[in-house]
Each structure stands twice: as C-alpha cells, then as structure tokens.
C-alpha cells in the first residue's frame, strides 16, 4: 500500500526510472549483440531532428517539388565521413540505416538474402497491388517467381514486331508537334501502357489513339480505359506517401485512394474475366502469346491473376517509360551523342527513307554497342527504382559502416530497416570518377567500368533480380532505334532545368516532363 502510494505521488520519478532502465537495458543488450556478431558501432550518425520528424517532413516537402531523391543524395554527401557511404538516422520516429555501399547492398540482396525481408511493403502496397511478386516474401514470393519466370523467356521478350503498331501511333503524335517543343514523356507513358497491356492481356488499351490524331474516342473506350491511367498514377502517389510515412502509413487511406484502386481493379478484372471464361483448350489454341492466358493455365484464382498482372503492369509500363524519357532528355541536350548513335543505327538498320525495319530483332539490338552504352548511362544516372529497402528478419550484420575507418561490420537489429540508394551509389565518384554526375556513354567502353559488379544495379541483384529486365531493355532499344530512323534532329527545350527535378513514386521519371523538339 505504501509502495503504491509512493508510485502515485512520485509518478514522474517512476516514469524516468523506467525509461532509464529501458535505455540502459537496451544499451547493454546491443553491446552484447555487437560482441556476439563481431560488429562495431556505426561511424556516421546523421542528426534527424526531433525523433526524425524534421527529416520526415523534409522528405515530404522535397517530394512535392521533385527533390526527394536528391535530399537523400545530399544526406550521404553531408555525413561526417561521406566516403563510407553508410549512416544511421530517423524518419517519423523510426530509426533506419541508409547505405550506398555495394558490399552492404550485395549482402542484403544476395549473400545474406535470408537475413532480410520486405518488412511492411505488403501493408504499404496491398490496397493497389495485392499479393504479387513485388509485395511478397518467403514461400509466397518463391511461388510467384516460379509462376512468372517462364513468361519472360527469351522467346517472349524477343518479339519486337508487336511494338511497331504502337510506334506508328507514337510517330503520328510526334509529327503532329513538328516544329514545336512538347512533352514526350507523357507519350512514352501512353506507349508503354499500350504495349504492356497487349503483352499482358492480349488487347491494348490504345491510349495513343485519340482525337488529336484522328481517332473517335468513344469508339475505343472500354473497361474504364479513359479513367484507368489517371487512377493508376494517383494510386502510386498514395502508395509512395504510405511508404514514406513508415509506421504511420495507415494515415493515407482516403476515399479518393480507395476510388482509384477500385477503378484499376475493375479495369484488370475485365481482362481476367475474359481469360477465365476461356476453356483450357481455347487457351492452348490462341495463336499469339498472351501473358494472362499463359498464367491462367497455372491458376484459375482471379485474385492471384489480378495481383500478379498489376505487379507486372507497374514494372512494364513505368520503368520503360521512365528510361525512355530520361534517355531522350539527355540525348536532346547532347547532340554529339545523338549524332554518334544515329551513325551506329544507320549502319545496322538504315535510316528513313531506307530504314530496314524488318531487320530489327532482339539479337541484333544486343549487338548495338553504343546504343547499349547510352541505355546503361541513362540507367546509371536515372535508375528506375532509385532507392529501396529491406528489414532485418533476425539480428544480423552488414559488412561495412562501423569502426574508426567505417570498414568494420555493423549490427542490424531484428526488425530494423535498411534503406539502400542505387541513385547515390551510381553517382559515386569512387566508382565512376570525377565526372560521375555527367552523362557520358563512352565510360561504358572503359575496362574498369565494365567490371564494377555491384556498383551498377539498375535491375537489382541476387534472387530478386528483375525478371523483366530484358523485356524493358528490348522495348527501350527498339523505340530509340525507330526514333532515330524516323527523325533527324532532337533538341531539348532551352527552358528545361538541369539537373532535372525527378518524380519518385514507386519508380522514377521526370518531374516536369521531357520537353523536346523532334524533326
């Protein structure tokens, strides 16, 4: 009774004692784990301000003006020991480790793969993407990957001929804007959603077919096509914000978010119903390859089909559109690179009016060395997924970041987040020299750059390496070749700021578009 009265009277002392006990206990246990795992204290601790809320709100503010990824890049450079490339900080109350060290990234993605998971990603992304290959861990992910891997065989990704009808529509839009600057990024997003839906569903949404080039919009609208692209884009904005808020992700669950998800699901369900009403015999008889129909041979579960299709649609549309947009943006401000690329493409496939379109194939595109260098340099400066993260599934370590020189292992507590920045890694002067922030495709012919390994990760690495990377590279290569064959000059608007602001949701593209003039 006396003890209870003492606690009630001196409650503040009791709380302070409990807090101190918790802190001391945590400190002692952390030191024990560090000794057990032969780890050293992390060298760089970046001031996060008020439990990370300062940094969290900085990130939200930067996101609104296309500077979110540059904010993190700046944090790496402002650390006490920027060459170490690993620090610990907080965001919205949650402590996390940030790294651009290739050995740390290799550990998470490959050599210590089982020590790390996607953590809360399913909670962040499930309202739109459900349980698909990009949101699942463990056995669910293994099953998804086994199901999807055959759909990205060389025979499927090598079918470039299906792209030509979509390019012809893209070409009409470019010709329509002849002599003036226009945003080609918007057209690339429409091109890739058209080609991706044809690959996935057997029917294109034909978003490039509009009144401006002579098509009747009412005749080609189906399954909510007109609303789909806008809803898909808005849903990704919401998902990105949920991810930024970490443990507070549930705050982003507005009626508009739910409305957008419903539109996207209704759109995909239209195609899934068509696939499921077809008998197995009808699926086998289909003359051309259709991703969804092949998937329907493995499962008849409409939710599984929808979730996997939307996961692939996200990757198939957004990553390739972003790659094409950044490539054309840089080609437009580097006329010497454009001229050199035209020379290679002219030698391989001819230029209009003598273009040999029928010669363009998966195999020959891979032989265009300067084209590959241009694409690699674009992916280096502007990786489709500029930052990513993993959660520790158990108490473990990362190879670098600790000790007096930052080269000793660091402890990663179970449940702790590690964010890795491919964007910062691929602009590191340690690996790419003093001109690391410059667009210079010629660097890819230098032996030391070709041997960088884990310092170049445009498609991730390890067991979760992107299944569709050849699909994206082939599509981007084909479009660039056809642009070069069809048009002689490419110019970036002099009003376009450089470096460009970058819109980062689940993937990255240009915040202000790619204003170019093509003739």
Swiss-Prot record:
GO terms of molecular function: heme binding; iron ion binding; oxidoreductase activity, acting on paired donors, with incorporation or reduction of molecular oxygen, reduced flavin or flavoprotein as one donor, and incorporation of one atom of oxygen
Any Pfam family matching the protein: p450
Residues where heme binds: 466
Documented EC number(s): 1.14.14.-
Induction, as annotated: By N-alkanes.
GO CC field: membrane
Keyword Heme listed: yes
Main location per the UniProt record: membrane
Source superkingdom: Eukaryota
Compartments, as annotated in UniProt: Membrane
Keywords: Heme, Iron, Membrane, Metal-binding, Monooxygenase, Oxidoreductase
Cofactor: heme
Function: Together with an NADPH cytochrome P450 the enzyme system catalyzes the terminal hydroxylation as the first step in the assimilation of alkanes and fatty acids.
Record-stated family: Belongs to the cytochrome P450 family.
Protein name: Cytochrome P450 52A11
Gene name of this polypeptide: CYP52A11
């Amino acid at each position: 009774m006396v003890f209870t009265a003492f606690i009630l009277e001196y409650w503040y002392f009791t709380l302070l004692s409990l807090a101190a006990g918790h802190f001391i206990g945590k400190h002692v246990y952390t030191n024990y784990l560090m000794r057990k795992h032969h780890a050293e204290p992390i060298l760089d601790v970046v001031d996060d301000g008020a439990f990370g809320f300062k940094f969290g709100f900085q990130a939200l503010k930067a996101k609104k003006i296309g500077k979110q990824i540059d904010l993190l890049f700046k944090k790496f450079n402002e650390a006490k020991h920027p060459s170490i490339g690993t620090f610990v900080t907080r965001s919205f109350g949650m402590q996390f480790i940030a790294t651009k060290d290739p050995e740390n990234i290799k550990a998470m993605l490959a050599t210590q793969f089982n020590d790390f998971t996607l953590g809360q990603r399913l909670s962040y992304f499930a309202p739109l993407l459900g349980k698909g290959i990009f949101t699942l861990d463990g056995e669910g992910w293994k099953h998804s990957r086994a199901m999807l891997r055959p759909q990205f065989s060389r025979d499927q990704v090598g079918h470039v001929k299906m792209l030509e009808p979509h390019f012809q529509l893209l070409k009409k839009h470019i010709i329509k804007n002849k002599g003036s600057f226009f945003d080609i990024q918007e057209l690339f997003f429409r091109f890739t959603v058209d080609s991706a839906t044809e690959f996935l569903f057997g029917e294109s949404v034909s978003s490039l077919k509009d009144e401006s080039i002579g098509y009747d919009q009412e005749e080609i609208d189906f399954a909510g096509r007109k609303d789909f692209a806008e809803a898909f884009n808005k849903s990704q904005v919401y998902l990105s914000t949920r991810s930024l808020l970490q443990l507070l992700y549930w705050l982003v669950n507005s009626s508009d978010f739910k409305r957008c998800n419903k539109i996207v699901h209704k759109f995909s369900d239209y195609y899934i119903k068509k696939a499921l009403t077809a008998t197995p015999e009808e699926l086998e008889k289909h003359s051309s390859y259709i991703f969804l129909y092949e998937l329907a041979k493995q499962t008849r579960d409409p939710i599984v089909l929808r979730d996997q299709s939307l996961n692939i649609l996200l990757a198939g549309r957004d990553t390739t559109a972003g790659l094409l947009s950044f490539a054309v943006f840089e080609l437009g401000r580097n006329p010497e690179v454009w001229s050199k690329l035209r020379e290679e493409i002219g030698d391989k496939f001819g230029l209009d009016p003598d273009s040999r379109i029928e010669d363009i194939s998966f195999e020959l595109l891979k032989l265009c060395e300067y084209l590959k260098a241009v694409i690699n340099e674009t992916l280096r400066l502007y990786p489709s997924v500029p930052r990513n993260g993993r959660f520790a599934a158990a108490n473990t370590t990362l190879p670098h970041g600790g000790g007096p020189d930052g080269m000793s292992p660091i402890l990663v507590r179970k449940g702790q987040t590690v964010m890795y920045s491919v964007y910062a890694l691929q602009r590191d002067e340690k690996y790419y020299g003093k001109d690391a922030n410059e667009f210079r495709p010629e660097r890819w012919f230098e032996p030391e750059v070709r041997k960088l390994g884990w310092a170049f990760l445009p498609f991730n690495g390890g067991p979760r390496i992107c299944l569709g990377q050849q699909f994206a590279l082939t599509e981007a290569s084909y479009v660039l070749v056809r642009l070069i064959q069809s048009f002689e000059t490419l110019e970036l608007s002099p009003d376009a700021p450089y470096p460009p602001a970058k819109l980062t949701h689940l993937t990255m593209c240009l915040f202000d578009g790619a204003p170019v003039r093509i003739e």
